[in-house]
Amino acid sequence: PAITMHSFSDEYKQGTYEIIRTLPISPLQLVAGKFLGNLFIVLVAILPTLLYAFTLDALSDIGGIDWGATYGSYFGLLFLAACYTVIGIYISSITKNNLVSLLVSILVCLLLFKGFNGLSQLSVFTNGANFYISKLGLEAHYMNMSKGLLTAEDIIYFLSILVLFAIGSMENIKGKVKYIITVAVLISFNIFFSIYNFQLDLTKEQRYTLHESTTEIIAAINKPARVHLYLGGDIPPYYKNIAVAAATLLERFKQINPNAISWDIEIPGELYKDDALYQFYDSLSTLGLPIQRIQTENGPSDKRVDQLMIPGALIEVEGQAPIVIDLRTSKKYFKPYNIVKDIPEEDMEATANAAVSLLEYKFTQALYLLNRKVIPNIAYLTGNGEPVNLTVNHLGESIMHSYNLAVFDLKKGFPNPQKIKTLLIVKPTQAFTELDKLKLDQFVMGGGNIVWALDKLVAEYDSLQKTSGAYTAYDRSLALDDLLFKYGVRINANLVQDLNCAKLPMVVGKGEDGSPLIQRMPWPYFPFLQGNEQHPIVQNIDRVLSYFPSSIDTIAVAGIQKTILLSTDSNSRILSSPAVVDINSGKQEGELESFQKNHLSVAVLAEGKFPSLFSNRVSAVMLDSIKASTGKGYLEKGIASSKQVIISDADILTNQVDVKRGPLPMGMMPYEEYQFANHDFFVNTIAYLNEPIGLLASRSKQQLLRLLNRQKVEEHRVLVQFILVLGPLVLLGLFYLIWTGYRKRQFAI
């Protein structure tokens, strides 16, 4: 406005406007000339700011800045500057007073940028009306571009503003433009492109491009949801990034379905103090929200301050129990450290980056669960010695709120795949009869899914504690080998060890007073398992803790696709049955050299139409049993596609029980507070087997958290300050000298 206020008002005041009108130029040429001249001055002022972008790129840690997003932000700034310019020219064309032109232009620009957004916040606008009102203002469209997202809707909106005020200026000059028709055409264009919108995501990781399945799920939502993001207030920058990314994602959801979602970013407990504050946190913890104590650096002294925060969100839909989302990721990243250290320092920035990558999946899944019309039935199988005690407490709690969970006794009937979507077979200890296997086989032939969590050998840590330090693990004899082999999988009778493993407290000697010295030592019988990054079940999850796993081989079966989900690390070995479980395993001299194998499979996904184990050998008694129990005939091959996950360590899905604290989460040992990704692996497996395939597809999204390298900033602080403060001024000065020199030579007489 300060630049454009002289455009026409000075011409009116000095009487030169009449001279200009006598020149052979049209009103369009006159307005365009004024517009381009003023916009050129604005661009000259903006271009030196590119120096800031180059400086940030040089000081960044990994990957540099996202130049695609930077280009998009400059596009947005260009459109915004163009709109302010044309508005200023229009206001200048209706007044002779420069000051009036300046003040009115500022007011109009401010109202267009902030006014509609503020109006949309009023409580009277509900059911999506607030979203459409905010879209009338400049801010909503500029914010998309500033993030690197170019949409047809935003571009058409900005062009409409330019055309509207440019024609207004021409009308003031000529007075013969059909203004009403123009406005009607512009409104029609904006409505059309708001419905048939397309976008160009300039960001490097395509962070604003939602997966196709996500778009379909959000568009189909018919129950409005309210999201509470508890990441407001003074929190570390890496959590700020998560909050901003979550808000941006929810805004994209709202653009797809304005009635689907509303949200706010809250400061947890800002209205409470002392005991009331603790009660507030306790109530949120009861709902399942994560409560985390963090240490933040405060001020230039880098003094560390303890702080409670809630890195989670609560989604509410009327008439349903709310769903809690943990915005963190189970996959932890660590700074470079000496391997001798027990507890490496977590790289919070990198971990937060992994969390951002999972936001689309987490919010989409929660909204899908709250809006689905049919809830799948999952049955926990009993009848063959499966545990029904506290060791499967977390397993039940993990899925009982999202699915219909029940117990099915295999001895009492045939599981019906039309009623039961998935069977959970967890740690059976008794052999399966031929009739048992027939029941499971026909369940698979009918399209039912099964999770097999089996212990091939009898090997328990409790048994070791009752011996002198060693015992022999033997075959559990479950009689399932032929059934699994028919489906293309074989669990071998062995134990797998790996040097990347859990550390257990062990007696390593005696102190001076004769008391035992206890130290946590690596125990390769409890290896950490790595996920296959190419499959959504295990993509972007942390290590999975296992207890005495066996190796798995896959066998070619026509029409069956098999995918390795979990495997050991790069320093593994196999102990064939009868395998000795020794407290000192891996410690003997020269023994480490035997860990030469790598990536031994421990969990496998098999999917397709499976062949029946009993093909060509089903007896008349079996046929009668099937007919009597199901009312249907024997199925020789699968009539529908089925999915099976075979895990060679049942304890991956069970939890330990602490004497004082009770049942622990999956993947947590009593003497550690670190929780491995066993729970994530389980719930992702359940989602893959029971929900639409596309629901997990968004887990594959990767986003790089672009942060400054603090060491570079500190080393070059003075130089950076000098460049950022004086650099733009120097560039503007050089431009002035070059421009004035050019004009002198161009117009010299």
Per-region residue spans from a language model:
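Secretory targeting signals
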Residues: 32-98
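Transmembrane helix boundary and interhelical loop/hinge segments in multi-pass membrane proteins
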Residues: 2-21, 35
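Hydrophobic/aromatic residues in alpha-helical transmembrane segments
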Residues: 4, 16, 52, 86-87, ...
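Peri-membrane helix termini and adjoining interfacial loops of integral membrane proteins
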Residues: 50-59, 125-140, 700-703
